[in-house]
Amino acid sequence: MEYEVPASSVEAYQETGFAVLPAVIDDRTLGMLREECAYFVGYTDAGMDAQGVEVMGITHRGKRYFISNRYRSSARLADFLFGALMAEITTSFLGESVFLFNEQWVVKGADQGMKFAWHQDSGYVKAFDPATTHPPYLTCWCALDDMTESNGTISVLPHDVLGTRNHIFDHEREQGSNDLIGYAGAESGEVITMGAGSVAVFSSTSLHRSGPNTTDQQRRVYLAQYSSSPLMSSTGELWAQAVPFITQGEVVYSKQDDLDDSAVSPRIRKTIRAKPKQHG
């Protein structure tokens, strides 16, 4: 039986700005995501080696990784991002029009995984485009490990606590970490504890943070973000990407068209791009 998002989860999202979908990613897919995560962390470490640096943006070697928009360098990730599970989740919360806006690995290293301050995902858009008026988009926070306070899970503030439903706070950059901070008050939020294979969904205007990882294992998340329409800057330019996924409730994504491009990483197996042979 295919998964269906419970009506209670949609209601919770509409009321508070977030919801948890327990154990929705099957074991085989979970294993694939963990393998891909290991590849991209290694790739990022190699990139820092080549540049002779320990920090790239908000990525800190061994402590915290944010690795964005690399799915076209994988033969397998598109099957998850544009598959039946994500189609069900995204249409339940966004409606009949869905675009992939952003995807990234978020990994906290063992023992030394850094915290991440209170912020709104939309705050990172506003930081570069103060005049932005984009509607909230959907973050799907996919747990590749059991998420606990000890390994640095997220805490989320319900919309009504600080009035974040359709409001993007100004964010300030923190020296050293390069984090953008949107709130520094006393509210503690709701701690999201959930098992591997679960997905936390929240609005891009929801304030959230994560603690440090004090365990002896990595804490791994695959984060996929979707919008109901392309996100455009205040000057009319496209933000990140807008890969068509769902139109009028139907899947329109074509992996063949998306990955059959000379710019796609050679890591993609040739069979993904192979066209039918002509006989005659």
Language model region names:
Residues 114-120, 127-130, 150-159, 165-169, ...:
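A short secondary-structure junction signal
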Residues 1-16, 22-118, 123-124, 129, ...:
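Non-heme Fe(II)-dependent double-stranded beta-helix
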Residues 54, 120-122, 171-186, 237-243:
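Short, surface-exposed loop/helix-turn segments at secondary-structure junctions
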Residues 11, 147-207:
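Double-stranded beta-helix
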Residues 104, 120-122, 142-146, 158:
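Short, structured patches in soluble enzyme cores that scaffold and shape functional sites
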Residues 126-149, 193, 225-228:
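Short, conserved beta-strand element in jelly-roll/cupin
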Residues 108, 157-164, 225-231:
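Short edge-strand/loop segments of extracellular domains
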Residues 43, 48-55, 199, 206-280:
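Non-heme Fe(II)/2-oxoglutarate
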